[in-house]
Amino acid sequence: MIISASTDYRAAAERRLPPFLFHYIDGGAYAEHTLKRNVSDLSDIALRQRILRNMSDLSLETELFGETLAMPVALAPVGLTGMYARRGEVQAARAADSRGIPFTLSTVSVCPIEEVAPAIQRPMWFQLYVLRDRGFMRNALERAQAAGVTTLVFTVDMPVPGARYRDAHSGMSGPNASLRRIGQAITHPHWAWDVGLFGRPHDLGNISTYRGNPTGLEDYIGWLGSNFDPSISWKDLEWIREFWKGPMVIKGILDPDDARDAVRFGADGIVVSNHGGRQLDGVLSTARALPAIADAVQGDLKILADSGIRTGLDVVRMLALGADTVLLGRAFVYALAAQGEAGVANLLDLIAKEMRVAMTLTGARRIADIGRDSLVSLP
């Protein structure tokens, strides 16, 4: 299959992956209205074309939390990334490292912190959930610090798991799910050989290191599901802010008042996000939520954004709406599933190329030049 655009990787991933895995990353909550609007609202935003601006010295570089990024992009935390390619977190981290951007390891990664961090040169970011088992949280934070993690991404929009109906249809969950997954793996021999056989162990590395005695991936997913904490409040985050001395980013902000609370809390950054449309269907797309949040807190902390970003043009649109940096989630997993580390590296090259074209034709020589005046319309 020819890959000529960043969006080509989705079809390539669908061909390679068993349906239960493809639809797990591709799907969203309930009827998936927010999932769809994340993409459509962003792609509907019109950029303002400018000409004859001497764009010969264009640069994508930016600064974030004391780091120089080759472009204002980081790879988002995505659970089970190691099921999409053999030791997938390591492959994705290496690709990000080679292109000069951060990689964020998920709490529910297949590869543990101690396997991923030594595989790359630049400091890694780590994502953590609020769980009932505070001992696990402290253990994860201590291990992250020991591994040289610089930035903590704290996900707060998952006090309960979202209802993802597509998973029951695809075989990720529901009746006879294990048998259905085995049948799907048999009909996808490349994945079965590369990941199903040689990608073991298939557990959640960060959790198995803490719990020990693994009894299978489903056991860990069950433990995680029972540990999400609906009683979470800002007060529950105070001990983490005291413990974690590096940059701390609150992920899952969709309302300006919550963004202001993050400033008062002392967060270094926020991620404007609806969890890729995977939690509460019917909420605002990130593109629609971002402008008001940026107006409320820009300059008080760093603003990151995710959900719906598929191309370099989308990156420029998010920056124009008020983001300092964006996180890529599904887009990099599609590329990883299709072509491994090389696929993620190529995706990032395509994103950078698309950004350069968009910036050249909107008259923005530097990332700081991208703003609301780069747009004809807001979402």
UniProtKB/Swiss-Prot annotation:
Catalytic activity: (S)-lactate + A = pyruvate + AH2
UniProt GO cellular component terms: plasma membrane
Subcellular location: Cell inner membrane
Top-tier EC class: oxidoreductase
Single GO biological process annotation from the record: aerobic respiration
The entry's keywords: Cell inner membrane, Cell membrane, Flavoprotein, FMN, Membrane, Oxidoreductase
Topology of this chain in the membrane: Peripheral membrane protein
PROSITE patterns: FMN_HYDROXY_ACID_DH_1, FMN_HYDROXY_ACID_DH_2
Xref: InterPro entries: Aldolase_TIM, Alpha-hydoxy_acid_DH_FMN, FMN-dep_DH, FMN_HAD, FMN_hydac_DH_AS, LldD
Family assignment from sequence similarity: Belongs to the FMN-dependent alpha-hydroxy acid dehydrogenase family.
Protein name per its UniProtKB record: L-lactate dehydrogenase
Protein species of origin: Stenotrophomonas maltophilia (strain K279a)
Lineage: Bacteria, Pseudomonadati, Pseudomonadota, Gammaproteobacteria, Lysobacterales
